[in-house]
Amino acid sequence: MNYIPTQTFYGRRWRPRPAFRPWRVPMQPAPPMVIPELQTPIVQAQQMQQLISAVSALTTKQNGKAPKKPKKKPQKAKAKKNEQQKKNENKKPPPKQKNLAKKKKPGKRERMCMKIENDCIFEVKLDGKVTGYACLVGDKVMKPAHVKGVIDNPDLAKLTYKKSSKYDLECAQIPVHMKSDASKYTHEKPEGHYNWHHGAVQYSGGRFTIPTGAGKPGDSGRPIFDNKGRVVAIVLGGANEGARTALSVVTWTKDMVTRYTPEGTEEWSAALMMCVLANVTFPCSEPACAPCCYEKQPEQTLRMLEDNVDRPGYYDLLEATMTCNNSARHRRSVTEHFNVYKATKPYLAYCADCGDGQFCYSPVAIEKIRDEASDGMIKIQVAAQIGINKRGTHEHNKIRYIVGHYMKEANRDSLQVHTSGVCAIRGTMGHFIVAYCPPGDELKVQFQDAESHTQACKVQYKHDPAPVGREKFTVRPHFGIEVPCTTYQLTTAPTEEEIDMHTPPDIPDITLLSQQSGDVKITAGGKTIRYNCTCGSGNVGTTSSDKTINSCKIAQCHAAVTNHDKWQYTSSFVPRADQLPRKGKVHVPFPLTNSTCRVPLARAPGVTYGKRELTVKLHPDHPTLLTYRSLGADPRPYEEWIDRYVERTIPVTEDGIEYRWGNNPPVRLWAQLTTEGKPHGWPHEIILYYYGLYPAATIAAVSAAGLAVVLSLLASCYMFATARRKCLTPYALTPGAVVPVTLGVLCCAPRAHAASFAESMAYLWDENQTLFWLELATPLAAIIILVCCLKNLLCCCQPLSFLVLVSLGTPVVKSYEHTATIPNVVGFPYKAHIERNGFSPMTLQLEVLGTSLEPTLNLEYITCEYKTVVPPPYIKCCGASECRSMERPDYQCQVYTGVYPFMWGGAYCFCDTENTQLSEAYVDRSDVCKHDHAAAYKAHTAAMKATIRISYGNLNQTTTAFVNGEHTVTVGGSRFTFGPISTAWTPFDNKIVVYKNDVYNQDFPPYGSGQPGRFGDVQSRTVESKDLYANTALKLSRPSSGTVHVPYTQTPSGFKYWIKERGTSLNDKAPFGCVIKTNPVRAENCAVGNIPVSMDIPDSAFTRVIDAPAVTNLECQVAVCTHSSDFGGIATLTFKTDKPGKCAVHSHSNVATIQEAAVDIKTDGKITLHFSTASASPAFMVSVCSAKTTCMAACEPPKDHIVPYGASHNNQVFPDMSGTAMTWVQRVAGGLGGLTLAAVAALILVTCVTMRR
C-alpha cells in the first residue's frame, strides 16, 4: 500500500456543500424503499412555501413603522430540513444544548478547521468512547495505528486496512461515493503558522509545535491544514517541552512519506483508563458511587485513591472524586486547580530556628528549597498552605495553617521571604512559593498569624545564582537580547511534577487528659481520641466522646487524636502512620520550563587597530566576560572576567582571531601584511619594508649580505696585493732591472725603472713572441670573463621570483583532466581552467560555503543533579521494626532503638526505651533533570558534509555532498564526487560530554562506575528510564533525642561541582576556527585539509569555438595593486575581437586570484579585472577565451592593519622579493662579483707569468 495519497479532482475544501435545487432530491432521512423521484413535487411545494414566507417576513420588516422589538432570528432555509424538523422548532431545547451554549466561542482558525473537518474526518470509537480520528486525504482514508477502535462510519468501518508500523498508520482506499468529501494534501511546508482543530500550529525548523495544553490524548489522527485547506500532516502525539509541545506527525515530502517523532513523545490516543475498587474495575473518570465523592465519604474516598495511586488513570479518578463528577456543579475556572487541597491539610513540623535562634514546631516550617531555575528564581516548600482559607476553598489572599488540632487562616499580605534582603514573591499556591531573592547564606519565611504573632522558620541556605549569559548583572535591563534559560512557570495548572501525600499519624496531645479525684478524664471535644492507660485492664481503645478512666493517673495514660479523612505532605519531620506507607499524589504548581531571559549587552569596546594586534578599551557596568581565541591550528584560548575599566591587547595573526565581549556576538578579525617603507624604493626603504614584515629574516639577510660584501672586498684586496707582490718581486731582487710598462701599470710599479710600452712590447716581440701575445690578450680576457660572469649572474637571478616558486595553491587543472583539489576554507574561491578541443576554454569555480563534521555518537548515559528522597520515619512504639528491601538507587535503611520522640502535643510513644525508629533514604533524579542534564557520548568516525558553490559557464548552483569519495552529486548535467578529505582530523575526542549547547572533550567514568562528588555520580540512559544508578555516599545518622527527623550525610552533587569546574568548552577553544554546535553534535567550517574533486563535465557545458568571440592582441596593464588585501588589484585588459560575447577569464598562476570567472566581451576591446595577490611584484598569465597575456605589477602594502575578512589568495611561506629589491641585489652582486673576478684574474695571470720564469 502506497501511503502517499493521489491528488484527484475531488479535493473540494472548506466550502459549504452546494445548495440543493428544487429539481434534485435532498439528502434527508427517508423511509426505506422510497423512490426519490416520487418526492419531488412535495419538496417543490415545501420550498416554494418557505420562499413565500421569507419574502413576506422581509417585506413586513422593511415597511414596519413601529420601533423594533426583540424577535427570534429567522433561521436560514436549508434543503436538509424536513417537516419533522419544523415541528420541533418550537420545542424547548434539551438542557445539554443550554450547556453547550456557554462554551467558549472558537476563534477564526478553529472555525476554519471545523468547516474543513466537517467532511474529511471521522471519529474512532471504542466501547462508545472517542479514542481518535480517521482522515480522508486524497484517495485514501488514514487512521493512526495506535488508535484502537472502529471508525464511526459503516462504509469506512468495513474496509480492509493495511498497517504500517514504520509510519504508525492504517490505510485503505476511499469508497467511490465518498471521494468528494476527501481533502487535498501537499508536501509544500514553508515555515510559518498552520491550522488545526485547536488553533494555530507553528512550523519551524522541520518541527510542528503548539502551546502546551492545546492538544491532549484523543487528538490523534487530526489533520493539520495550510491556509488553502490542504492537509500538510496528521497528528500522532506530542512531547511536552515546557511552554510548547512538539507534535509527532506523519507528513509528506515530494516523493515519500516521513514521520517525525520528537524525544519524549506520547501517543494521543484516548485510551480508557481503568481503576479498581474491591477487586472490581471501573473507568477512572467515572468512579462507582460507593464511594464516588470526597465530600460525601472522605475517608473511604482517600482509601480508594491510595489503592489506585500507581495506575495511569489516577488523576482522572482524583478529579472525578474531587468534583463529584457533577457537570452541573463543576465549572472550569482557575479555582479548579485548588480542588484537591480540600482533601489535604497543613501541618506542624520541627524547625531548628524559628527566627529567634530557638527551635519550635512551626506552622511555616521549610521543607525544601529548589533553585534549578537559571534565571535565579527559587521555589520554596513550606508546611502552611497559601491561597486556601480554613474551609478548604480557594481564596487568593489567605494562608491556611495549623494551630494545635485546629485550622486557622491569616492574610497572605503578611507573607515574607528573606535572604540577605527581602525577596520579591512572584507566585504562591498550596505549599509552594516562588520568589526572586538577593544572594545570601540563609533563608527565612514568616507571616503574621490571626493573633498578629510572627510565625517564622529559618534555615541555612547559600543562594548565589549563576549569571545568565556572560554578564553578572543584578537588574533586568530595559534593552538587551533574549537568551535561552529556565524558569518556574507562573501557572497553577496541573503539571507533570507531583508530591506525595499520606495519611497523617495520630497526634499525641497531653492536654486531652485531666486528673479528677484519682480518675483520668479524656476530653474528646468532638475529635476521635485513641487512648492507652496501664492502670487496670481494658483501658485501650478509641472514643469520640468524653471518657473517664477510674483509679488512674495522667502519667499512666497516653492519648492521641486520630483523623484519617485528610492527607498531609509526607514530611520527614512527621512520622508516618504505617510501616508500609499508604500515599496519594497531587500536582506541583510552578513547573520548571524552558524560556528566554533578557540579558544586557555590554557597551561596545573602544577598538584601536595596530600592527598585528588589537587594543580594546573595556567599560563594564558589571562583571563581564572577555574571551578570545586564534583561528589557526593552535587556538590559545583566553578568558577573563572584567569588572572595571581596563585595556587589553589581543594579538592578531593572518590566521585570524575571534573575540567576544559579554553578550555581544563574537567578532572575527584577520591581520594584513602592513609595514613601513616601500618595496619599490631605495635600498633603505626596501630594508625597512622587509623589516616590518619579517624582522628576523631581514636582519639575518642584511647581516649576511654585509658580511659577504666585506669578505668579498677583503678577498679582492688580498688577491690584488698578492698579485702585485708576485709581479714586482723578481724585479726588486734583480739589480738594475727595469719593470715593463704593462706590469708597471698593473702592479702600480714606479715608472722611473720601467721601459715604455712600445719598448717593452718590442723587446717581447724580439725575445718571446708567446709572452707578447699573452700580454696583449690579458686585458681582453679579463673583460670577456667579466662580461660572461655578469651575463650568467643576470640569467640566474632573473627567474628567482620567490612568489612564483613558492605558493600554497593547488595546480591548475589541464585539459581533459577532470580532477582538482580545493582548499577546505570557507569563502576561498578555487578556479580551474578547462580546455577541450573544439570548444572555447571554460573556467570552473568551486567555493566551499560551509562544512559540517558530524561524528557518530553512542550515548553512554545522562547525568544530572540528584535529589534525596527521605520518607517519613516509621516509629514503632513499645516494639521493634525491621528494614525491608527496596529497589531504589543508593537505598539506605537503618533501625534505631531506644528513641523517645516528641511532637508538639507531647511524647509520641507511651514507652520510654522500647521504641524503635525506622529511617529510610534513597536517591532519585531531580525534577530539573528534564531541562538541565549532561549527556556522555562515545564518539566514533566523523562524517563530513560540505556545501559547495559550483560555477561554470552560465551555471551558478549550490549543492551539498558528503566528502567521502563515494557520494556523487549532479549539477547542471555534470557529476561531481568530493573527497575523501586529505586530513582525517576531528576536534572531538573519543569521549565527549554535551551540556546544553556546549561540548566538552572529557574522559568520563563508564556506566555503573560513578564516584561520589564527581561527574557521573548519578547515571541513567534517559531522563525517564528506570535504570538509574547512583553513588552519593549517602549515610543515615541516629536521630537526636526527642526529635522526629531523619538525619543523614551525603556528598554534594558531582554534577553541580562539574558545572562550576568544567572549564572552557570546545565551542571556545576548537582549533582551525571550528564552530561547535549541538542537535546534532557537529563542527562547522573547520579550515583544515584539502578536498579532492572528481568531475565529469559534458560537452554541452562548453561553448564551441565558432560561437565564442575571437580575442587577439591581448595586453595587460595594472592600474592599482595592493598586495595581501582582498582583491586589491585592478588590471585593464585591451584586445581586439570580431564580435561581442562571453569569455572565461582565468589566471594560470597561483600568484594571483582573479575575482571574475567570466566577462562580457564588447567591441570596444577593453575589460577590467580585479585580482588578489600576496606578492609585491606579481607576474601572472591571464587568459581571455583562447588569448593569453602576462600581467606584471608593482604592488604596495595595504594600509589597514586589521580587516574583518580573510585573504582570498594563497599566502607565502617564504619572504617574497620585489622586483626592485632584486634589481638592487643584482647590482650589488654584479659589482662585487666583477671586482672579485678581476682580482682572481689578476692573481692567476701574475701567477702564470711568474711560474714561466
From Swiss-Prot:
State the residue spans of region: Host transcription inhibition: 43-77
Keyword Lipoprotein annotated:
yes
Q: Which residues form the active site?
A: H146, D168, S220
Signal peptide feature range = none
Annotated region (E1 fusion peptide loop) at 899-916
**Region named Binding to the viral RNA:** 90-121
Region Transient transmembrane before p62-6K protein processing: start and end of each range?
727-747
Q: Which GO terms describe its cellular component?
A: host cell cytoplasm; host cell nucleus; host cell plasma membrane; membrane; T=4 icosahedral viral capsid; virion membrane
According to the entry, every stretch annotated as the Peptidase S3 domain falls at: 120-268
Keywords associated with the record: Capsid protein, Cleavage on pair of basic residues, Disulfide bond, Fusion of virus membrane with host endosomal membrane, Fusion of virus membrane with host membrane, Glycoprotein, Host cell membrane, Host cytoplasm, Host endoplasmic reticulum, Host Golgi apparatus, Host membrane, Host nucleus, Host-virus interaction, Hydrolase, Ion channel, Ion transport, Lipoprotein, Membrane, Palmitate, Protease, RNA-binding, Serine protease, T=4 icosahedral capsid protein, Transmembrane, Transmembrane helix, Transport, Viral attachment to host cell, Viral attachment to host entry receptor, Viral ion channel, Viral penetration into host cytoplasm, Virion, Virus entry into host cell
Specify where the region named Ribosome-binding lies, as residue ranges: 106-120
Task: Tell me where the transmembrane regions lie.
Answer: 695-715, 770-790, 793-813, 1228-1248
Where is the short sequence motif Nuclear localization signal located?
Answer: 70-106
Q: Where is this region: Interaction with the capsid protein?
A: 722-726
Query: Key word Cell division present in the record?
Result: no
What does the comment on domains in this protein's record state?
Answer: Structural polyprotein: As soon as the capsid protein has been autocleaved, an internal uncleaved signal peptide directs the remaining polyprotein to the endoplasmic reticulum.
UniProt name for this protein: Structural polyprotein
Species the sequence originates in: Sagiyama virus (SAGV)
